[in-house]
């Protein structure tokens, strides 16, 4: 990390504050969101219901996106698994050499024996 942002050098204190804030948002998103919603309600109590409603909608949209992302990842993993399974030769399709079936699985075993 060079410490440059928008062409200016950032002091260590600023880098530390930004890094701490980013880390908190990444590791504790629910607590950070609750903090901001609480601050908004305290700053403007007459809009408390609207603020809470907007926060709830945001959480529901985030959960929906996370659900679809996880479902997509699971579907891709299942597709890869099916692809690999469908393209692996089974023992019935292998040309088993003689009575020793290990020669088909490990070709050099006949040379050793």
From Swiss-Prot:
<comment type="similarity">
    <text>Belongs to the UPF0416 family.</text>
</comment>
<protein>
    <recommendedName>
        <fullName>UPF0416 protein RF_0879</fullName>
    </recommendedName>
</protein>
